[in-house]
Amino acid sequence: MKKSLQIGYLITILLIFFVPGLLFVSGKGKSAPDTEENRTLSAMPKLEASTYRVFPTQFEDYFNDHLPLKDQLVFANSYLDYRFFHSSSSDQVVVGKNGWLFYTGTQQGDEAQMKDYLGENLYTEEELQTLASKLNQAAADFQKRGAHLTFVFNPNKSRIYADQMPAAYGKPAENYRLKQVVQYLKANTKLDIVDTTDVLADYHKKNLQNQIYFKYDTHWNSFGSYIATGLLAQGLKRSLPSPDAVSIQDGKHPVYDLARMLHLQDILTEDPAPIVSGYTDRTYESQMSGEGAEIMIHGSCASPEADARKLLLIGDSYGTFMFRFLATEFAQTTYCHYSQYHRDVLEAEKPQEVVFELVERNLSLLNSFSIDRAFPQ
């Protein structure tokens, strides 16, 4: 029996190693042209006198792209890593307790989410002084054009769900960059700063049954966003009902971005996607333009109970969650992704209130923020 099992394992391993190669040579079972990587697949290189030096590398790229059963093998590897070894097949994702996924934050800019968590990317005193000076200047420039500026900072998922982080990372640092920036700006400037960390952490601690961030995604869910937007609304002299006073229904589950990074988006689907209702009787109409990072959303609320001020929300993807709750509070609300913001947007919208929103991992974008742009040139 034991010998038969060993032979079975050996045959399985041989099939895994040799079947894709045999199919590749025979030209059968080629991978589909559409991949999760969203790029053009490598073409078969030509072996010529002028290309013989680079041919091996080019052929390797072609082989990797067109290997038969590639997608199935990638899926199998990711599934085994996640389900049985509680590890990640991607350097962009770590697997935490109870199957929770966390983003390592290294895809763009100087994101360093694990350094945020461990407090390893603190600013120096000089850097804080420079940052405060820049933001003071930005607020003054907006004020000259009749717009009051508010900053709102939202915590990383690992900050709120530290209880689900891998044990190897330990507890989150007591002092970390977001906390450092907020404390410095509040102590040394008159800027309006809203930090939603404490209100979200307190809610999670007292209400473990209500999930406020997605398990398989980098983002908070709609309910978590509602809690945070309630705090922002107070800073804008508006108010939203208590989280305990609203209704929550389970909505359509999105494709979770961290699950997609592991090629497991088709099986990691059991993750609450709450829809919040009952917080207002007011409605709004919206128009959306652009896609992805180029998205802009314009909302208008005709209710006489809506604030007559025009609001411009400049932010990252977390801001899109906040938009729907703000859109019923103001007569006109516009969301603009930070990468698309420039002075022309301000001149076109002519808001009385401007909110610059960032999730913790994007905090370094503060160094680039001005009335002219919110993204490095």
Regions found by a protein language model. Give the residues of each.
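Extracellular glycan-modifying ectodomains
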Residues: 1-377
